[in-house]
Regions:
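Structural detector for hydrophobic anchor residues on beta-strands
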Residues: 6, 18, 28-30
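Short, charged, surface-exposed hinge/linker loops at domain edges
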Residues: 1-7, 11, 36, 40-72
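A short, exposed loop/beta-hairpin motif centered on an aromatic-Gly-Thr core
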Residues: 26-36
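ATP/adenylate-binding site constellation spanning eukaryotic-like Ser/Thr protein kinases
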Residues: 22-25, 43
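Short aromatic-glycine-(Arg/Gly/Cys) micro-motifs in beta-strand/loop hairpins
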Residues: 11-22
Length: 72
């Protein structure tokens, strides 16, 4: 077995629901009402996404996140 560390983007919507997005895995995301539930669901979602992407999976090096603010 191989151990992976995935960066996860966590956002909170207008209803207070947490949304977790895994940029390294196409289409891999989940949501939950609490952060602890989100962590559990993220592990489940990542495991499922890895099963799908097992053949061509390449993990990029995580550099960081930025928040860009602009007025248009």
């Amino acid at each position: 077995m191989k151990t992976y560390k995935f960066p996860v983007v966590v956002e909170q919507d207008e209803d207070g629901v947490y949304i977790g997005l895994v940029p390294d895995l196409k289409g891999c995301h989940t949501q939950a009402k609490t952060l602890s539930a989100l962590d559990r669901r993220l592990k489940e979602a990542i495991a499922l996404c890895l099963q799908v992407e097992r053949r061509g999976f390449h993990q990029n090096k995580f550099v960081g996140l930025r928040q860009v603010e602009m007025t248009v």
